[in-house]
Structures are given as C-alpha cells and as structure tokens.
Regions:
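Positively charged n-region of N-terminal signal peptides that target proteins for export
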Residues: 1-4
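Generic alpha-helical structural signal
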Residues: 11-12, 101
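Sec/Tat signal peptide C-region and signal peptidase I cleavage site
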Residues: 13-17
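Central antiparallel beta-sheet cores of small beta-barrel/beta-sandwich binding domains
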Residues: 18-93, 99-118
C-alpha cells in the first residue's frame, strides 16, 4: 500500500523543465536580416536573466521565462536610430537546442531562429 501511495504522489508531481542556463549561439533571420547573437542565460526557477552579445560593443540584458518546454526571452536593440524589442519564443527540443520565432517590435516583423547550447 505504501508503494502505491508513493507512486501516486510521484506521478502527480509536475514535470520539471530542463534548465536553460548556459551559453547559446542563436542563428536566425528577421525581415531578411540575419541575426546571430550569443546569449548567456541564467535560469532561476522559471525566470531567465543574462545578456546577449549582439556585436563587439553591445550586450543588452535579457529577461524571460520558462514554462515546461516553452522558452521566452527578450532584449532591446537599436537599429538605424530606432530601439526594437527582440522577443524570442521557442521550444526546448533537447537540452541543447531551442527552435522558434523571433519578433521585433514596434515593426511587427518576425522570423525563425535556432539556438544551440555551446
């Protein structure tokens, strides 16, 4: 009887998402412009923090979240005098791969990205 209770308790626990902490190499295309930041992410519970190295002089801070296999993070980047918020929303395919969509607001443009854990 104790085994059955223990199994039922274990089965009722939520599935834990993989930890996305680490360095991720992102490759994508948004409005025909390639994007290739290297993002250093830190997951604490369901929250993501860190930074994305966009170029040699720019590594904006990121914020985001993880819910099961769904991963979202964003940062601000200036391009031709306009500040855009790039938001990455993807699915953790494995411990080393995220695939999804990136959007740039306020332009309402989007594209696809793949991130590989280094």
């Amino acid at each position: 009887m104790k085994r059955i209770i223990a199994l039922l308790l274990f089965a009722s626990l939520p599935a834990w998402a993989d930890d996305v902490s680490g360095v991720w190499k992102v490759d994508g295309l948004i409005a025909d412009h390639p994007i290739a930041p290297t993002c250093t992410l830190k997951q604490t519970d369901k929250q993501i923090s860190g930074s994305c190295q966009v170029d040699a002089d720019h590594a904006p801070n990121v914020e985001g979240s993880v819910k099961e296999k769904q991963v979202t993070w964003k940062y601000d980047q200036e391009y031709e005098g306009t500040v855009y918020t790039l938001t990455y929303t993807g699915t953790l395919d494995s411990n080393t791969s995220i695939k999804g969509t990136v959007t740039a607001d306020p332009s309402d443009t989007s594209g696809d990205f793949t991130a590989k854990k280094q």
